[in-house]
Amino acid sequence: MASAVVSMVPTTASRFALLQVDSSSDSDSEKARGAHATGKARSGSAAKGKSKGNEKKKEKRRKKKEQQQSEANELRNLAFKKIPSKPSQGIGGALQEHSTHNVPKEYQEDDWQQWQQRDEQLTSDMFEADLEKALMLSKLEYEESKDNGNEVNGVPQSKKVNKKDKRRNNQGKDKPLTVPLKDFQLEDQQAKKQEELKSPAMPQDRGFFNKLEEDVTKIILKEKRKEHSSDVTESFSTPDYSMEPALKDGKTEVLKQEIEKKEAELKQMKSIISQWEAKYREVKARNSQLLKMLQEGEMKDKAEILLQVDELLSIKNELTLQVTTLHAALEQERSKVKVLQAEQVKYQGGKKSKKNPESEHGR
């Protein structure tokens, strides 16, 4: 299972691929032997140059060993969550820069390719190991949760890991030996696993298991209640069930009496409801009749009013005609009066003219 998952996941170079560190002193000895063999092939005139070159190589080896030890200590401190001291960091950086300047480019490229291959192999191997460990831990936790409830596995493993870490720390303090990258990666991953185990994720798992247990108990109780209710209904539905022992009790008799009283009350209520329904129907019929009468009365009143309006309009028309005739007669009379008045004035003027000459003649 783990190998299949690893084949699906692409492996990449780890963060340790950037470190230019040799695997052990054996590679250095092999390089020195090769350099020494090539030095022997040279002429005898360059013997002094060879001795100087050997001294330089020895110094380089010593510097490389010191660099490896400093980097190993730094990686140990990082794995066990320790802050490295500032002077050691400065010395390691200076040594690394000096070594990178002194090492030729061909060796650096070869070392770089070798380290890349090793890192890829290490990452794939470590990924497989982590998957296997995770699967085993999950299985163990599941089995222990079934058996013991909420116990968690992982405490003895952490103790073993701590013992191994202490031994490795003591070895690093006592012996100035180089440590391979596998051990550092293992220690780092084990420390991370310890932190994950110590993290407050387990109470949540416990709460989850407790909830599961509560849900299971609730479901079981519901099923039991359903079974009990089904058994009771079946016992009541069977003809073998007799009410004789229940009738003997006083409670059943009291209940029967109460039921009879309630039935009588229900009958009375039903009769009252039927009476009220009949009354409601009568009132409804009366209301319908009243509505019809009111509608008819309103129509009659409207018809009478319209007739009266017609009569009044006819009277109005007659009166207007009379007024017009009277007005014409009045104007005629006025014209006659005016004519008579004019004639009267003339008549009076003629009489006066006749009287005046007669008076003058008498004088």
UniProtKB/Swiss-Prot annotation:
Where does the protein end up?
Answer: Golgi apparatus
Biased composition (Basic and acidic residues) is annotated at: 98-107
Residue ranges the record marks as coiled coil: 54-79, 247-298, 328-348
Q: What are the entry keywords?
A: Coiled coil, Golgi apparatus
One annotated GO biological process: signal transduction
Q: Where is this region: Disordered?
A: 22-124, 143-185
- Superkingdom assignment: Eukaryota
**Main localisation, per the record?**
Golgi
TM helices/strands, residue ranges: none
Q: Where is the composition biased (Basic residues)?
A: 160-170
Q: Where is the signal peptide?
A: none
Check the record and name the InterPro entries matching this protein. Answer: GKAP1 (IPR026109)
Name the GO cellular-component terms: Golgi apparatus
Give the protein's biological function: May play a role in the regulation of insulin-dependent IRS1 tyrosine phosphorylation in adipocytes.
Family according to the record:
Belongs to the GKAP1 family.
Return the protein name: G kinase-anchoring protein 1
Gene coding for it:
gkap1
